[in-house]
A protein has these predicted regions:
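A short linear-motif detector with a strong N-terminal bias
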Residues: 3-8, 44-49, 87-91, 150-155
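Extracytoplasmic/periplasmic, Sec-exported soluble proteins
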Residues: 16-20, 36-40, 58-60, 76, ...
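Cysteine-centered nucleophilic/redox motifs
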Residues: 68, 83-100, 174
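Active-site neighborhood of thiol-dependent amide/isopeptide-bond enzymes
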Residues: 74-84, 90, 105-108, 112-116
Length: 174
């Protein structure tokens, strides 16, 4: 018996880690970085704020970072849209920071420019008449300016894109 291995139980500092995330979108008017009051009262924004408050108060949770990712719809000059997305990320961060005053959390704002990937996803999921043609244009051209021009040439469809798809891409994603 003397040669038998044995185990000693000792205290440890193991803490179970779980990652939880919440999301919300703040939408903007075309060419504007101004956060409208009605956007901050939307249910998804209120739920996001409640999520942050609840998790920041929990003893078993270490709060991460609240990211404000600014995007622009892919209509208009690319340089303008890059600056606009940066302004949107900053205004979205400022707005959510004001609503979450007193909560110890880090913030990070980043600009992502024109959201062609989001555009592709929304078009693919839509019931727009010429969606296959639009998706083909996206795969044929790498240039943002060329993509935009070719899609605008589909004038009947472009009006539908302006009302159904593009407004969803003008956002700060939290």
């Amino acid at each position: 018996l003397a040669d038998m291995p044995y185990m000693i139980l000792m205290d440890h500092n193991f803490k179970r880690v779980r990652t939880v995330t919440g999301e919300a979108d703040i939408h903007y008017q075309i060419n504007s970085p101004v956060v409208r009051k009605n956007q901050l009262s939307l249910e998804q924004v209120k739920l996001f704020e409640a999520f942050v408050r609840e998790n920041s108060a929990a003893e078993d949770v270490t709060m991460g970072t609240v990211y404000a990712k600014g995007y622009a719809s892919p209509d208009g000059p690319e340089n303008f849209n890059q600056k606009l997305s940066a302004e949107r990320s900053k205004s979205g961060e400022k707005a959510i920071k004001e609503n979450l005053k007193g909560i110890d959390v880090q913030y990070d704002a980043a600009a992502y420019g024109e959201d062609w990937e989001g555009f592709r996803e929304l078009v693919a999921a839509s019931d727009i008449a010429d969606k296959d043609l639009i998706l083909q244009v996206l795969s044929m051209y790498d240039s943002s300016a060329r993509r935009e021009q070719e899609i605008k040439n589909l004038s009947a469809v472009y009006n539908e894109l302006k009302t159904k798809i593009l407004p969803e891409l003008r956002r700060t994603q939290l």
